[in-house]
Amino acid sequence: MKLKATMAAAMILSVMAFSTTASADTFTLGRTILLEAKNNHAKIPVPLCRNAKSIQIKAERDVFLSKVIFKFQNGSSRVFQFQRKLDKNERTDWRRFSYERCVTDIQVHGRAEDGSAGIRVYGRR
């Protein structure tokens, strides 16, 4: 009886371990608090160097997203052009860097539909 209970507990723990590692691959790189209509870009400083292979953008309110600029630890940068309207809680597709990069700064360019909008930037290893 104890053997069955131990085996069941081991199976549950192994399933939980796999589910946490799958969600640990995606993390929040940063987010903006406001995108105002008169100021068409927002800077998101990344406090620590975060390694990411690809990124995804999520709009917390309606926004027109034009481009996002990522700056890396070695001084280089990468620009992703979007030129599209994102509705509330809509996400872009995953955009890949060439290889895993250390992101230090993010600039989001766009216009808020109602004067303010939140943008969340996700990273994946």
Regions found by a protein language model. Give the residues of each.
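Bacterial N-terminal signal peptides that target proteins for export
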Residues: M1-A9
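Bacterial N-terminal signal peptides
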Residues: A9-A17
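Sec/Tat signal peptide C-region and signal peptidase I cleavage site
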Residues: F18-D25
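Solvent-exposed serine/threonine-rich low-complexity stretches and specific carbohydrate-binding patches
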Residues: G30-L35, V79-D87
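Short, surface-exposed binding/anchoring microloops in extracellular/periplasmic proteins
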Residues: L35-L65
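Exposed aromatic-hydrophobic patches
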Residues: H41-P47, R91-S98
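Noncatalytic modules at the cell exterior or secretory-pathway interfaces
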Residues: R50-I57, S98-E113
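Short, surface-exposed beta-strand/strand-loop-strand elements in extracellular ectodomains
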Residues: R61-F82, R120-R124
